[in-house]
Amino acid sequence: MSKFAIQHAPEQFSELVFAQSDIQRRLEEYAACKRTKPIILHGTYGGGKSTIAKLLVTARDPINRGFWQTINCSNVEQGFLTPIEGTWRFAELLEVEPMCVLEEADLLSRRNQFDLRAFMDQHGGMFIMTTNHLHAIDPSIRSRCDCIEIEPPVAENYLPVVQKILASHGVAMGPQPLLKVLDACRNWRDVLGA
């Protein structure tokens, strides 16, 4: 991610922009700890799934007790859940919700997916998984999760955020020229690079 994109990335769940209000409301319920089922965020590249996952975890743990981990599944090996289990047990002793973000969960091997399913059944807790390929996640895991498709917002959804970013750099532009540029953007990465 570029320095500009990092500088203007959302820092709180409330700063996220969604294409669908029903998905936003559903995820707000997760952020407020009103829902507890594990989540699989799926959709196209650059739709913001990893950012949503990170901000959901920080919303659910606002004082940052640190009982959560983020794992990119592209390079995990057999036994990848062992360190998570230690964190999980300690969190449970303190009566804190253990959480784990599994990015690119579809890249877990079949064996690792079965281990994950068994871990979910044995320990519970909040898993938030991201994937561009929902079909590559075993149906037994999908059935235990709330599978939420994240569609990239459209130009009108991005407009207020883009105007705020431009204003922070002393640039004021009306909506029409910005909408022309934003109409060509397919996702957040395109918007931040425009």
Enumerate the language-model features and the residues they cover.
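Conserved catalytic/switch belt of AAA+ P-loop NTPases
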Residues: 88-89, 102-143
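Pre-Walker A (pre-P-loop) alpha-helix and adjacent loop at the N terminus of AAA/AAA+ ATPase modules
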Residues: 2-44, 86-90
